[in-house]
Amino acid sequence: MDTSGPAAFVNGEILKMFVGRRVRTVVQAQREEGGLLIGQSTDGHQLTIKGASGAPMSHYVEIIGIAEPNQAIRAEVCTDFGENFDPAPFNGLCKLANGQMKDLFL
């Protein structure tokens, strides 16, 4: 496992605490606007993903990239998780990884 550039697990609410840092999240693709992917985070926030165009609409997509202001992420890696993804466990993981269990995560 490469730990040289760890990515924090974030949902829409937690994303704003990591501006300028590498993050990992999952969004459900909703639409594309001018080369940007607009998606819904696992906790219901609307996120703008730069550099992730081409994702199938309604699919869940894992995004690893750099958090930017205004609920945006500059994508480095995008992985299509398909339509059958339960967002609740990932959202719970984000809360644990940034709350009471954060010492267990990079």
Curated annotation (Swiss-Prot):
One GO molecular function term? DNA binding
**Main location class:** nucleus
InterPro entries membership: NA-bd_OB-fold (IPR012340), Rfa2 (IPR013970)
Q: NAD among the record's keywords?
A: no
Q: Which GO terms describe its cellular component?
A: nuclear lumen
Sorted keywords for this record are: DNA damage, DNA recombination, DNA repair, DNA replication, DNA-binding, Nucleus
Where in or outside the cell it occurs: the entry states: Nucleus
Q: Per its UniProt record, what Gene3D superfamilies does this chain match?
A: Nucleic acid-binding proteins (2.40.50.140)
Key word Ribonucleoprotein present in the record?
no
Q: Name one GO biological process term.
A: DNA replication
UniProt similarity note: Belongs to the replication factor A protein 3 family.
Q: How does it assemble?
A: Component of the heterotrimeric canonical replication protein A complex (RPA). Interacts with RPA1B, RPA2A, RPA2B and RPA2C.
The entry's function note states: As part of the replication protein A (RPA/RP-A), a single-stranded DNA-binding heterotrimeric complex, may play an essential role in DNA replication, recombination and repair. Binds and stabilizes single-stranded DNA intermediates, preventing complementary DNA reannealing and recruiting different proteins involved in DNA metabolism.
Protein name listed in UniProt? Replication protein A 14 kDa subunit
Q: Which species is this record about?
A: Oryza sativa subsp. japonica (Rice)
